[in-house]
Regions:
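Sec-dependent N-terminal signal peptides of Gram-positive bacterial secreted proteins and lipoproteins
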Residues: 3-28
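Short solvent-exposed beta->alpha transition segments
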Residues: 27, 33, 37, 48-99
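Solvent-exposed, polar/charged alpha-helical surfaces in well-ordered, non-transmembrane soluble domains
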Residues: 33-40, 44, 48-52, 65, ...
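Beta-lactam-recognizing serine transpeptidase/beta-lactamase-like catalytic domain environment
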Residues: 311-319, 359-409, 414-644, 652
Length: 670
């Protein structure tokens, strides 16, 4: 009997313990469930729902409006995002509450941070568990009366330097022009009129900025002006109520001549921010939009730093800190004076020009015309600029120096070099050509190749280059043959992707990389067909005449790529003199196509070219582009190519010829 009673007592005790355990587990689960709800709305930064889950005494301690304001202000200031909360244990304090330790990670303006030693206390009220809140649920170290502060450490963007180490782009100061409304009120209409005239902006724009302001003691920003624009600044400083302050800004040197090459920075867009969301950008960041500023964005941009800290009286308690990391400088091979000279010679005509040093491969100039002054994007657009840009209809942003074009007769150097190397061309031997038209045979149907001049005699290489005889070079190309021509062109980099620090369109020998059709091969020989080259490709090809047949690896970023090395052995050294003689005749001989490009004291080899853009041979409405390329061959310093678009009935290749002559004379004699 006693034994049975003992067994019964043991059974009942076990049941009681189990019930207690289940009840305890159930309570802890309820608390964790409640905290998980709080955690989820916290991660979403749903501060209203967070406040709704506070205990009664917590709501007495802090009102809803203050709660929302504190979290919004703090999280906004630190740029909190991508939050995560992990429970790391539990501690039962009494029968009605449970403390849940947790850690938090988030992305902030100082990078990703981890906050440890959080503890949330949950208490039961009306059959539900509530959060017992205090300041330590903002940051674990935080106490009442503490303030959260943020210091920004701004990184400096790397500078862009020219070959001499002078600035083409740098972080500097501009002058911010603003109006102090209360001091501007007297004779306001006259002041607005005067200010608009000085700045070349509309009076209505100034009026709109003033109308949007509600506090007469608040400065109203109008525009920013370059600090060396002394005429504007002096005239503005005499107007009462105008305030001029320094403002950090990107600043460019070189004006329109460097616009398409250097590019510009401006505020990041929402789309750009999304596309670069893991790179440390914020909604206040500047980002490269074009040119070198865009190509080298990752190198130039700095990484901003900062510190998040708690201010407790005189004490500063650091939460997280990251030092700013300045961007890297870039040194270019560009000669800014040469760049400016080329641009001024082009006089706004649509086209492009590239100059290289034949001995080193350094790119001395890369010009696109028309262009823009990058400073417009960090200051403002005057009415004059707006009118000019409306007429250009976006043409100023078309970066032409990295476009590819039909090279026209400038291709004849490539054809001649291949012919000499292949042994199918004897420079002294005359070719019998009669008339101004030619076709290989009747299989060409009605298609004929034409030339401008019939000298009435057999012509050799020198004559053919000097007179720019298309028939001669078409026949040389046919004698070379498809495979040899394609392979020979590759010795000049044609049809290959060029290794260069600036994105360029790739040259091509034809659309399908073959020259299997006779007419296409023949046309390619004198620069028509489907062959395409950039101004850089053309300048490099002719640089071989000044460097014993070698083409150097083109270099733009000399700070990173400082070693000169051969890229292509384009022409056999023993063949160079014959080519120099032939292509110098274009300039040195009185009847050469570029006789007016001679520079006293220097031997210059070069070639004019006109490339036709038309549907077929009968099309007379097509446009023409004019080329000229030149290289000084003795102690060679420069090879320069230039293309001017749409020169038909306007002077043809004589337009770039005159421009390049002036540039060569300037550069060689300076």
């Amino acid at each position: 009997m006693k034994s049975n009673l003992k067994k019964l007592s043991l059974f009942i005790g076990t049941i009681i313990i189990c019930i207690a355990m289940v009840t305890g587990c159930s309570k802890k689960d309820e608390i964790k469930d409640a905290f998980n709800v709080y955690k989820d709305v916290w991660i979403k930064q749903d501060f209203k729902s967070m406040y709704d889950m506070l205990s009664t005494d917590s709501k007495s301690y802090i009102g809803e409006e203050e709660f929302l304001e504190r979290y919004n202000n703090i999280y906004g200031a630190i740029e909190a995002s991508n939050m995560d909360i992990q429970i790391v244990g539990e501690k039962e304090r009494d029968k009605k509450s449970l403390e849940i330790p947790f850690t938090m990670t988030m992305n902030t303006m100082v990078g990703k941070i981890e906050l440890k030693d959080f503890e949330a206390t949950l208490v039961k009220e009306d059959n539900a568990y509530k959060i017992k809140w205090n300041e330590s649920l903002i940051f674990p170290q935080m106490q009442p009366e503490d303030k959260v502060r943020v210091d920004d450490y701004y990184a400096k963007r790397g500078s862009i330097l020219d070959r001499n180490g002078n600035f083409l782009a740098q972080d500097d100061m501009v002058k911010s022009i603003g109006i102090h409304p209360s001091k501007f009120e007297n004779e306001k209409v006259a002041k607005i009129k005067s200010m608009a005239a000085i700045l070349d902006i509309s009076e209505s724009y100034i009026e709109e900025q003033l109308a949007a302001n509600t506090n007469p003691e608040h400065l109203v920003p109008i525009v920013s002006v370059l600090k060396y624009d002394s005429e504007k600044l002096n005239n503005l400083s005499g107007i009462e109520g105008i305030q001029i302050n320094n403002k950090n800004s990107r600043v460019y040197t070189g004006g329109e001549s460097i616009g398409n090459l250097i590019g510009y920075v401006s505020p990041i867009t929402a789309e750009e921010l999304e596309n670069n969301k893991d790179k440390g950008y914020s909604h206040t960041s500047l980002i490269g939009k074009a040119g070198i500023e865009k190509v080298y964005e990752d190198t130039l941009r700095g990484q901003d730093g900062g510190e998040i800290y708690i201010e407790r009286g005189e004490e500063k308690i650091s939460i997280a800190k990251t030092e700013a990391k300045n961007g890297q400088d870039i040194k270019l091979s560009i000669d800014p004076e040469l760049q400016a000279k080329i641009y001024s010679e082009m006089k706004g005509k649509k086209g492009a020009s590239t100059a290289v040093d034949p001995k080193t491969g350094e790119v001395l100039a890369m010009v696109s015309s028309p262009s823009y002054d990058p400073n417009v994007f960090v200051t403002y657009k005057t009415k004059t600029i707006k009118e000019q840009w409306e007429k250009l209809d976006g043409e100023q942003f078309d970066n032409r120096f990295n476009n590819v074009y039909a090279p026209g007769s400038t291709m004849k150097l490539v054809t001649a070099a291949i012919g000499l190397d292949e042994g199918v061309l004897n420079p002294e031997e005359g070719m019998d050509i009669k008339g101004l038209e030619w076709q290989k045979d009747a299989s060409w149907g009605g298609y004929k190749i034409t030339r401008v001049k019939d000298p009435g005699k057999d012509i050799n290489l020198r004559d053919a280059v000097k007179y720019s005889d298309n028939i001669y070079f078409a026949r040389v190309a046919l004698n070379i043959g498809e495979d040899a021509f394609i392979n020979g062109a590759k010795n000049f980099g044609i049809g290959e992707e060029i290794t260069f620090e600036y994105p360029m369109e790739s040259s091509q020998i034809s659309n399908d990389k073959t020259l299997s059709k006779e007419i296409l091969l023949a046309d390619t020989g004198y620069g028509q067909g489907e062959v395409l080259m950039s101004p850089l490709d053309v300048a490099l090809a002719y640089s071989a005449l000044g460097n014993n047949g070698d083409i150097m690896q083109p270099r733009l970023n000399v700070g990173e790529n400082g070693e000169a090395k051969v890229w292509k052995s384009a022409i056999k050294a023993e063949k160079v003199p014959a080519l120099v003689d032939a292509f110098s005749a274009v300039i040195n001989d009185a009847d050469g196509t570029a006789a007016n490009a001679k520079v006293d004291g220097f031997n210059i080899a070069g070639k004019t070219g006109t490339s036709e853009i038309k549907k077929d041979q009968k099309d007379e409405s097509g446009k023409e582009n004019g080329w000229f390329v030149a290289v000084n061959t003795d102690d060679s310093k420069i090879a320069i190519s230039m293309i001017i678009e749409d020169v038909k009935d306007r002077g043809g290749s004589s337009i770039p010829t005159a421009m390049v002559k002036n540039v060569m004379e300037y550069y060689l004699k300076k």
